[in-house]
């Protein structure tokens, strides 16, 4: 085996040992790309919140938006979904929360508007159909 081939092989083994591809470290990259392929305007944003998600993405809806929170564990996702549920109960026509595994989807419309529920469900379905 030549030296360049051996170096390339070692690099591949090293990358795999360090966690694999970039998308393995970014749990929403594939979902955002898939949503965009289906006509949604989606982008990743800086994660924030308590518990802190591993990644976050925002999807534009007709006069509203859906936020996808990707958590490391199901327990963190459940804790976040429970916290968002209070917001949903206070304004059920404006806010919708749905948990799928370690992901939490939150649809929000501005005050005085109504969340386009079908659009929100389309975001969840399109995002989840990959997995």
Where are these regions (language model features)?
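Short secondary-structure junctions
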Residues: 36-49, 122-130
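An anionic, turn-rich surface loop/hairpin at beta-sheet edges
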Residues: 48-53, 78-96
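A short, solvent-exposed beta-edge/loop patch
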Residues: 89-131
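Bacterial N-terminal signal peptides that target proteins for export
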Residues: 1-8
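Secretory pathway targeting signatures of secreted, lumenal, and periplasmic proteins
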Residues: 46-65
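A short acidic-to-branched-hydrophobic micro-motif
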Residues: 62-78
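Bacterial signal peptide processing site
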Residues: 19-22
């Amino acid at each position: 085996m030549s030296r360049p081939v051996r170096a390339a092989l070692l690099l591949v083994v090293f990358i795999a040992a360090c966690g694999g591809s970039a998308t393995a470290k970014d749990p929403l990259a594939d979902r955002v790309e898939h949503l965009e392929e289906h006509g949604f305007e989606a982008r990743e944003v800086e994660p924030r919140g308590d518990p802190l998600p591993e990644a976050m993405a925002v999807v534009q809806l007709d006069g509203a938006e859906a936020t996808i929170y990707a958590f490391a564990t199901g327990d963190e996702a459940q804790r976040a979904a429970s916290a968002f549920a209070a917001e949903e109960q206070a304004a059920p026509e404006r806010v919708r929360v749905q948990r799928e595994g370690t992901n939490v989807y939150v649809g929000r419309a501005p005050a005085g508007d109504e969340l386009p529920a079908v659009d929100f469900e389309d975001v969840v379905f399109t995002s989840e159909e990959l997995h």
